Amino acid sequence: MYASRQAYKNLALFDFDGTLCKKDSFTGFIFYALSKRHIVKQGIKILPWIQAYYLKIYPAHAMRPKLFHAMFAGATAADIQALADEYAAGLLSQLNHPLYQQLLKHQQQGDDIVIISASLDLYLTRFCQLLDIDLICTETEIIEHKLTGRFSTPDCSSAQKQIRLKRKYPLDHYAKVYAYGNSKEDLEMLSLADHRYMVGEDQQLPPILSHAGKLA
């Protein structure tokens, strides 16, 4: 049995790409950090997989690590990180306004807020620092100051969102759990929530209850 809930705050979980952020931040970072020549040269090497992905016969969770390796393997970590920090600041202008306002409401009443995303720690770490919120995401591997092109964690989508969330947060310690997503990769995360919102399906954001059970 689960322990009775004793905490006095809520937990708010936000997917990033397509939910809190209007754009595909993963692809956007590739075009921000790398030259068009490099992107074309490396993209040609994985063109069959890119085509299969756009035909919806190669899944996103498999495409992301393949694309990351093709584009970033061997890059100097410090150079990419400097660009990632710049990119993170720019993402503040790309937020989905209603979802961002919902995040601020959670923040104003002291809820714990977590971005849980398959996108990269390279820029999401800085982004979350700017908003003073927590992060669970796909983490990149660096060895001897170089990006290896591999992830140091599994792609943080679908079941991995649920696994990593439960590993870090005792959900029964919160008054209520809220979750916001936009795709089938968020379903396992949404299944953990008392109040859930799917972009493109649900018409209204859930009302946020105060820790005393009243509307915030």
Per-segment meaning from a language model:
Residues Y2-K56:
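Active-site neighborhood of HAD-like aspartate-dependent phosphohydrolases
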Residues Y32-S35, E86, H195:
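Residues within well-ordered alpha-helical secondary structure of globular protein domains
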Residues F26-T27, R64, Q162:
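A general structural signal for well-ordered alpha-helical segments in protein cores
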Residues Q51-K56, H61-A77, L135-E139:
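Short, compositionally biased "basic patch" segments
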Residues K41-G43, W49, H61, L99-L103, ...:
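Juxtamembrane/interface motifs at transmembrane-helix termini
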Residues M63-P98:
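Metal-dependent phosphoesterase signature
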Residues Y2-A3, K9, A89-A216:
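C-terminal cap/substrate-recognition subdomain and adjoining C-terminal extension
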